[in-house]
Amino acid sequence: MASMSPRICGTWNQNGWLCSKMGLHITSQTQKCIPCVDKEDLKSETLGMVVKAGNATAMRAIVTTETEEDITLVTECVGKIYNLEETDKNVWTLYGEPETTCIVNQPATVELTCATLVNRIPQLIDAPAGYVTTDQFPYNEYMVHPMNCYVKSK
């Protein structure tokens, strides 16, 4: 059997991006991956198979980022096969004064991901040559006019 190297979840990059946007300086970052199982067989249309009870049906990736400013970011991303009682949701909780939680039930994940990428095209055209990380881009904006109206380097 081939050995498997550890995988870094997208949440790892997300924490770095958030810290950069907030002017925080990262001192350490760790990721913990936790496999999840279901008590019943789950049919996956995407995989074209039934995953037997007790086999992995999900992975929780928990990334903890410590900063010089004594602010800790803990983010979690779960990729899974849903059982009949489950739906996708995004939950963000900011701990502090006041504690705030935002929950988006059944987000349009595919559409939101595609819209975010497409709306970045004018910024990509305007970006300097070379490798530029997205934390250096301006904030994304909703385009109400044709895309070419947002290209500034014409």
Model-derived regions: residue spans:
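Active-site-lining helix/loop region of Rossmann-like oxidoreductase modules
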Residues: 1-80, 85-88, 107, 114
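C-terminal helical cap and adjacent loop that interface with cofactors, partners, or active-site loops
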Residues: 81-154
